[in-house]
């Protein structure tokens, strides 16, 4: 593994080039005892001042190409990332994830600046330094947390923590009288860029809170915080509490409206179902009625059958013309049928003439007999 030559150091004390001379035998015999990357996530990451690293092996510098090819298991690539990490959010976590996955075998050290340095160079923070330290310890990508990290990285700090590379976004970070606090790191070939996550930052979160300050103040008053704790005046406190009562009434009215709408919808659904069932029953009833009492219904057919039976029972059958009884008595002739012809008679002129005509008619009858 190449070692650093003393003649290739820049003015800042950071080595700029690497020699290809093989290490001496004494250097190979000494094993690395530096902390290894965390294999389990059941405990938070340790602080740098608690690890007590006593590794005596010389820390040989690596190029980015060598680090990407991979290193021995006992020689992880030590990557450093620093920041304020106020209101730790997903953008911070993604940046640390990128720093952790830059190389196959990496050990991620995260430096967190103290409150004094942050308030001096950047401004007031929402979380204090202890809270920010703890937030970083519980990030799964972090192997070690360095408290009170320097604002500008010095050669002594890099050598103390045996840092191979520094990971940060490539945007120049002007602060502390410098156009870019990572300029000397970039010149030394130790800078590895990461990508920022758009749409999320600590400043954006604070802007949301300030924009909706009244909403959050009312919410916290409702949850039991006092006006003194929220730094709210007496008048604003009463206004917020009154607004909370108004919102409660609005919520109740809204709930009643929603319930009434649900009730109306249920009634409409049930009435619709009821109407459908009633229509089905009506169609069934009408169909059954037509089948029974319609023009070709069963009732009419039954009435016709009964009527025909009654007619057959009431009217006897006529005997045929050539019946046996008529053939047995051939001598008997049917009685003659007489047709009375109309006679024109003049009215009798006298009672005697009328009696004479009647007597003549009776005599004629006796002669026929």
Swiss-Prot record:
Disordered as annotated region, ranges: 1-27, 309-369
Protein name in UniProt: Choline-phosphate cytidylyltransferase B
Subunit composition and interactions: Homodimer.
Pathway: Phospholipid metabolism; phosphatidylcholine biosynthesis; phosphatidylcholine from phosphocholine: step 1/2
Residues recorded with modification Phosphothreonine: 345
PANTHER family for this protein: CHOLINE-PHOSPHATE CYTIDYLYLTRANSFERASE B, CYTIDYLYLTRANSFERASE
Top-level taxon in the UniProt lineage: Eukaryota
Database matches in InterPro entries: CCT, Cyt_trans-like, Pcy1-like, Rossmann-like_a/b/a_fold
UniProt KW Plastid keyword: no
EC number: 2.7.7.15
CDD domains: CCT
GO terms for cellular component: cytoplasm; endoplasmic reticulum; endoplasmic reticulum membrane
Organism, scientific name: Homo sapiens
Keywords, in A-Z order: Cytoplasm, Endoplasmic reticulum, Lipid biosynthesis, Lipid metabolism, Nucleotidyltransferase, Phospholipid biosynthesis, Phospholipid metabolism, Phosphoprotein, Transferase
Gene Ontology BP annotations: CDP-choline pathway; ovarian follicle development; phosphatidylcholine biosynthetic process; spermatogenesis
């Amino acid at each position: 593994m190449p070692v650093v030559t003393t003649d290739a150091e820049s003015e800042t004390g950071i080595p700029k080039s690497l020699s290809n001379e093989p290490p001496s035998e004494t250097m190979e015999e000494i094993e690395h005892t530096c902390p290894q990357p965390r294999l389990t996530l059941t405990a938070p990451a340790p602080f740098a001042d608690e690890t007590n690293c006593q590794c005596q092996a010389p820390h040989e510098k690596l190029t980015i190409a060598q680090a990407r090819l991979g290193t021995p298991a006992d020689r992880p690539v030590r990557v450093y990332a620093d920041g304020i990490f106020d209101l730790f959010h997903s953008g911070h976590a993604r940046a640390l994830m990128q720093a952790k996955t830059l190389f196959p075998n990496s050990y991620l050290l995260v430096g967190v600046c103290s409150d004094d340095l942050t308030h001096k160079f950047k401004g007031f923070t929402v979380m204090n330094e202890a809270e920010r330290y703890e937030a970083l310890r519980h990030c799964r990508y972090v192997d070690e947390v360095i408290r009170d990290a320097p604002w500008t990285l010095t050669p002594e700090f890099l050598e103390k923590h045996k840092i191979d590379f520094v990971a940060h976004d490539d945007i120049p970070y002007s602060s502390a009288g410098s156009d870019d606090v990572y300029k000397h790191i970039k010149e030394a070939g130790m800078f590895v860029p990461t990508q920022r996550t758009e749409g999320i930052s600590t400043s954006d979160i604070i802007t949301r809170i300030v924009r909706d300050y009244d909403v959050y103040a009312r919410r916290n008053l409702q949850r039991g915080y006092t006006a003194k704790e929220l730094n709210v005046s007496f008048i604003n406190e009463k206004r917020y509490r009154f607004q909370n009562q108004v919102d409660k009434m609005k919520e109740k009215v809204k709930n009643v409206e929603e319930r009434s709408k649900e009730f109306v919808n249920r009634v409409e659904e049930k009435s619709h179902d009821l109407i459908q069932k009633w229509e089905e029953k009506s169609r069934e009833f009408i169909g059954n009625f037509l089948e029974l009492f319609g023009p070709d219904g069963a009732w009419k057919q039954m009435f016709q059958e009964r009527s025909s039976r009654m007619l057959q029972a009431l009217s006897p059958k006529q005997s045929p013309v050539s019946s046996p009884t008529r053939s047995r008595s051939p001598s008997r002739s049917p009685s003659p049928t007489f047709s009375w012809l109309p006679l024109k008679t003049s009215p009798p002129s006298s009672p005697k003439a009328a009696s004479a005509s009647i007597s003549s008619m009776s005599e004629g009858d006796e002669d026929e007999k």
